[in-house]
């Protein structure tokens, strides 16, 4: 079982990171285990047999990974791809590639016991990641962009929170500080049938959908009553994405 991570384009091929999920232990479902790197062809156009054809799937690309590095990523002008993961769901971590190619060597950003960070090629231990978080407030599902000379991180409040936070830093690997509430998500969905929901998750940022510099987010939800996901009026609308545009988002730091 795989959970989709982020992706990039290299040599006209789409590279997608797939996070392995282990459900063999009923007491610890959805446990992260390893990363698969799949490569797809971008030859032709959507609808062509060649377009998005699977070229290769390396199911053992990173068997050591248990922290979801690459769940989201940022391709920086410094030549690296920054790969974000998490420890304990709410401590953000970062690794980076040597080049703009996910198959190039990875390094992990780790703090020593004195709080000094450095890049290392060995996969970090649990003790290392416990002291290596890169943000100042608990959050999940980070997305990083750059505007001007500043890197901004957007992330969801903990426990499936219905608020989105914004952080800033002068580096893509943090520390991300100055946490502020960016916006709140509604308690009701624009759908038929039951409009309240249980969990809000998979808050994704879509820079390619921006028209005039605004932020575009999508969210997923599920029903309070599990059966309502399948057999009630509007059931299909629980899991489908809902989209939100956030204008003048930089103004939050003018307050």
Language-model regions, residue ranges each:
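Beta-rich carbohydrate-recognition and catalytic domains
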Residues: 9-64, 76-140, 145-193, 209-214, ...
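Beta-propeller and closely related beta-sheet repeat lectin domains
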Residues: 1-8, 69-73, 140-143, 201-207
